[in-house]
């Protein structure tokens, strides 16, 4: 509806999938009986976050290097494919939040296994993030999903605030 003599306001009806655009996967997306998007703890989605650049196949050794400083929230810029072993390393390290630029975290043959490793560990998983203009560094992240019970994912609009911003 639009503003007119009979309607005092604009009102839009949205129809979209839970995995359209930049979105967060809930554990329920790949793990039967797991938490839905409304049950993802918000502290996983808000706080200090490392942005790192990586291209290619991300191995367990690469994952361990990225988390060597104790990072709990990680956004990865670049065209990556996370290996199953890297997903397991992220899970074992206790990572809270992982975001990537691609539409999915795994490869064509490993996507299900990568998702299951990450989501079984209840890592908040962000896909299709727009990070091309974000330099590597540490930021404050705010990336809360919609608070809608039963969903296996949710559109998100991540915000990064530069701790070192001048002015």
Model-derived features with residue positions:
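Active-/binding-site microenvironments in catalytic and ligand-binding cores
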Residues: 1-167
């Amino acid at each position: 509806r639009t503003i007119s003599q009979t309607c005092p306001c604009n009102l839009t009806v949205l129809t979209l999938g839970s995995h359209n655009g930049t979105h967060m996967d809930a554990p329920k997306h790949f793990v039967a009986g797991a938490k839905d998007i409304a049950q993802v703890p918000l502290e996983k989605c808000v706080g200090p976050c490392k942005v790192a650049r990586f291209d290619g196949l991300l191995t367990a050794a690469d994952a361990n290097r990225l988390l060597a400083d104790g990072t709990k929230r990680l956004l990865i810029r670049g065209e990556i494919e996370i290996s199953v072993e890297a997903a397991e390393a992220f899970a074992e390290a206790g990572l809270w939040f992982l975001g990537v630029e691609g539409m999915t975290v795994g490869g064509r043959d490993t996507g299900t296994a990568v998702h299951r490793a990450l989501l079984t560990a209840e890592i908040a998983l962000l896909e299709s993030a727009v990070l091309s203009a974000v330099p590597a560094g540490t930021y404050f992240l705010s990336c809360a999903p919609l608070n809608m019970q039963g969903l296996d994912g949710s559109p998100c609009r991540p915000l990064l605030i530069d701790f070192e911003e001048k002015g």
